Amino acid sequence: MPLTPSHKGAVCSDCQGRLEDAVTAACGHTFCRLCLPLPPQMGAQPSSRVLLCPVCQEKEQTEPVLVPVPLGPLGETYCEEHGEKIYFFCENDAEFLCVFCREGPSHQAHAVGFLDEAIQPYRDRLRGRLEALITERDEIEDMKSREDQKLQVLLAQIESKKRHVEATFERLQQELGEQQRLLLARLTELERQIWKERDKYISKLSEEVARLGTQVKELEEKCQQPASELLQDVRVNQSRCETKTFVSPEAISPDLVKKIRDLHRKILTLPEMLRAFSENLVHHLETDSGIVTLDPLTASPSLVLSEDRKSVRYTRQKQNLPDSPLRFEGLPVVLGSPGFSSGRHRWQVEVQLGEGGGCTVGVVGEEVRRKGEQGLSAEEGVWAVILSHQQCWASTSPGTDLPLSEIPRRVGVALDYEAGRVALLNAETRAPIFTFAASFSGKVFPFFAVWKKGSCLTLKG
């Protein structure tokens, strides 16, 4: 049963005034009943008559010609069938009903109630939905506010780090500049001392040359004297002819020479020191110290992993694990995750060895043999060091003994994929253990092996 609500400000297509008792012709124009050329009867033109639309003058046989448009008072709704005000609502058909509709046979068995009563559950549902939407909106706004605060904190941290970097490099530049000035000042002072000692040396030589010149002149004159005169002063003349040993002065004192040599050695090492500093700085800034965890899909049945996948220990009783092409069988091995196919990476492992136990730490190629007979060598894609109480060696081919005074309590691994370099070191003392030169063709993974009861490896950092 169609309904048409009230139309605020509706205008008649004919008189252009406010619609009164509106009807709509088949052509689509809506106008007041009083504007019809023929008087309406019961809200419709008789079917035997021809309607002439007062607007478009279109003649059309209609049956019925007019459709009442029940606008009613502003804000009210009327039944199109009976023209009565709507008071009821049918829950079953979701229709608005007037008094006549309510008493009709179509809704006798239906749940029909007053509009105010029928609308309340819908209002309640709408209010519930509205409250839920408001709550959701508030939660989103709160979340946005929290994330904005986090963002502001991160931005503030970045700004602080920028200032820290600027200040650090400024201090470094100042320190380098100061060392440059000190070094140049020392060189200038040595240069001054060299000139001073040179002048002193030249002065002594000049004095000796002058003295010798005087003696030469005197002796030349004596040689020209008659024999009687020369023999009169024979003893004096003999003493003058005696050669005096000339002690040559030092052009530069030994102390000054030592200072020059010491400074020379220090200057010679400057380029290497600066190169090493630059490389270490680049390595530090470009090396990824991301989190490495143990991959349970690769773990040998002889190994037990911690829940956080940071620690592995050896067990005599093999576990019943699902078979996997990734799992190592035979050697008590587990790989780390993720694997690497580029870049620089580093991680550290804490070592704890049981009696007679040992461990292996390094990297391994993706295509390494995991089933059957397995070997530990660089030729088979394993670049690692084997540490035990009896012997320590690197997995070169043949193996390289490592003269370690003690087993490192923490081993650091530094991987440079592009350079083909795997360096292992004592993470506590920074002393190198061994460095491999390799050529990687695929992904490489952190490699760990541990054996004997009481032996354990734990990833740190």
From Swiss-Prot:
GO CC terms, sorted: cytoplasm; focal adhesion; nucleus
InterPro entries associated with the record: B30.2/SPRY (IPR001870), B30.2/SPRY_sf (IPR043136), Butyrophylin_SPRY (IPR003879), ConA-like_dom_sf (IPR013320), PRY (IPR006574), SPRY_dom (IPR003877), TRIM/RBCC (IPR050143), Znf_B-box (IPR000315)
Record GO terms (molecular function): molecular sequestering activity; transcription coactivator activity; ubiquitin protein ligase activity; zinc ion binding
Binding site for Zn(2+): 79, 82, 101, 107
Zn finger (RING-type) location: 12-57
One GO-annotated biological process of the protein: negative regulation of intracellular transport of viral material
Coiled-coil ranges (or none): 123-230
Occurrences of domain B30.2/SPRY (ranges): 272-461
UniProt cross-references to SUPFAM superfamilies, sorted A to Z: B-box zinc-binding domain (SSF57845), Concanavalin A-like lectins/glucanases (SSF49899), RING/U-box (SSF57850)
Primary location: cytoplasm
Entry's localization field: Cytoplasm; Nucleus; Cell junction, Focal adhesion
Listed EC numbers: 2.3.2.27
Class in the EC hierarchy, top level: transferase
Catalyzed reactions per annotation: S-ubiquitinyl-[E2 ubiquitin-conjugating enzyme]-L-cysteine + [acceptor protein]-L-lysine = [E2 ubiquitin-conjugating enzyme]-L-cysteine + N(6)-ubiquitinyl-[acceptor protein]-L-lysine
Function (record text): E3 ubiquitin ligase that plays a role in several processes including innate antiviral immnity, cell migration and chemotaxis. Acts as a 'Lys-63'-specific ubiquitin ligase for MAPK1/ERK2 and MAPK3/ERK1, promoting their activation by facilitating their interaction with MAP2K1 and MAP2K2. Also plays a role in cell migration and chemotaxis by acting as a stable focal adhesion component upon recruitment by multi-adapter protein paxillin/PXN. Functions in the RIGI-mediated interferon induction pathway upstream or at the level of MAVS.
Name of the protein in its database record: E3 ubiquitin-protein ligase TRIM15
Organism per entry: Sus scrofa
Taxonomic placement: Eukaryota, Metazoa, Chordata, Craniata, Vertebrata
Gene that produces this protein: TRIM15
